[in-house]
Regions:
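Short, small-residue-biased leader/transition segments that mark boundaries at the very start
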Residues: 2-6
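C-terminal substrate-binding/catalytic lobe of Rossmann-fold NAD(P)-dependent dehydrogenases
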Residues: 7, 14-179
């Protein structure tokens, strides 16, 4: 790995995405490994969830809700999102740190790099026109292999989701200007 490869990406929302998968899995009583869902944008208050892309065993989340209305409904989206954002703080307040979650995320990234996995992970990387964004490091699905970020995977989002993503990127850009 080159020095520049290591510093053009970060853990981003990988941990938040894992927490999201666990929350959804708890609602519908399936293994989190069966959930395909991402938290994108900033790792923080402006992060967003493109619910239209969430899949459970390949099945659209809205179809899951339709088929299982007693287990999950769209009204739960906001509470799940808030729980994902607050999970880290709850862990920190209880134990004084959150070292295991970020260690697991870092281990996942290192494994992808070391073993040339070409795996799609929601990590922070530099956008150069992807998603209509330029000059911002933010979390998006990216193919990670031994060279680092091989490719940014652009997923389709609804208009509202894209607006949320753009707002998150704008928030990050405004922070860059302050620094």
């Amino acid at each position: 790995l080159s020095y520049t490869t290591l510093f053009r990406s970060g853990s981003g929302t990988l941990l938040d995405s894992a927490r999201l998968q666990c929350h959804i899995a708890d609602c519908i009583d399936v293994d989190p490994k069966s959930i395909h869902a991402y938290v994108l944008g900033e790792h923080g208050d402006s992060e967003m969830i493109p619910w239209s892309t969430v899949r459970v065993g390949g099945k659209d989340i809205y179809q899951i809700i339709k088929d299982n209305p007693t287990r999950m409904n769209e009204g739960m989206f906001e509470s799940i999102h808030e729980a994902v954002k607050k999970d880290g703080w709850e862990i920190f307040n209880r134990k004084g740190n959150t070292c295991y979650g970020i260690a697991a995320s870092t281990t996942r990234i290192v494994r992808a790099l070391m073993f040339n996995e070409s795996v799609v992970l929601p990590i922070s990387t530099y956008l150069d026109g992807q998603y209509g964004q330029d000059g911002v490091f933010t979390s998006v699905p990216a193919i990670l292999d031994a060279t680092g970020v091989k490719e940014v995977v652009e997923i389709e989002m609804t208009k509202e989701e894209k607006e949320q993503f753009d707002a998150s990127c704008s928030h990050l850009q405004s922070f860059y200007k302050e620094v």
